[in-house]
């Protein structure tokens, strides 16, 4: 949806006031069946990009997954939040359900399925790298992020935090 795209791009550009105006100002224009869930998801995104991870998670947990595209977006966001909050056990549960969803869903294209599986693999390896400090996971991650991945910039930031890549290595 256009609402989601505008908010996501605004947040990626750190235009928080603009995003908040869109989130609240255009809620009434959303389709009534999706309005509340899209608004909750938008609030979760806003809080995630603002660094309010607990609040972001709270919004995510209130979303009812009745919209196909939202399921993928929400699970990805929840995985990133779990990483930020160092909640590996919760992340493992989400990873398991996300894998089943991707594997069993025939609506997703092969390319989209591959992209989402790669994202899950990256998140899994990020947790392993942070927990173990084993740089071999980092080198595997560097190879994986060369591909088309959702939230690639966020992943690169996490690799920077873990000292796997240097600023000049980012594309």
Residue ranges and their predicted role:
Residues 33-34, 49, 71, 84-87:
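Short coil/turn linking the two alpha-helices of tandem helical-hairpin repeats
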């Amino acid at each position: 949806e256009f609402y989601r795209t505008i908010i996501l791009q605004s947040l990626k550009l750190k235009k928080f006031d603009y995003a908040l105006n869109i989130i609240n100002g255009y809620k009434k224009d959303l389709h009534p069946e999706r309005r509340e869930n899209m608004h909750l998801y938008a609030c979760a995104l806003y809080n995630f990009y603002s660094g309010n991870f607990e609040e972001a998670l709270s919004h995510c947990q209130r979303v009812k997954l009745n919209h196909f595209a939202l399921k993928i977006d929400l699970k990805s966001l929840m995985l990133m939040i779990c990483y930020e909050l160092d909640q590996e056990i919760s992340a493992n549960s989400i990873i398991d359900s996300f894998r089943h969803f991707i594997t069993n869903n025939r609506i997703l294209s092969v390319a989209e399925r591959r992209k989402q599986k790669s994202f899950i693999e990256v998140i899994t390896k990020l947790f392993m790298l942070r927990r173990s400090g084993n740089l071999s996971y980092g080198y595997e991650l560097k190879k994986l992020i060369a591909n088309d991945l959702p939230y690639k910039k966020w992943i690169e930031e996490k690799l920077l935090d873990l000292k796997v890549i240097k600023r000049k290595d980012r594309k």
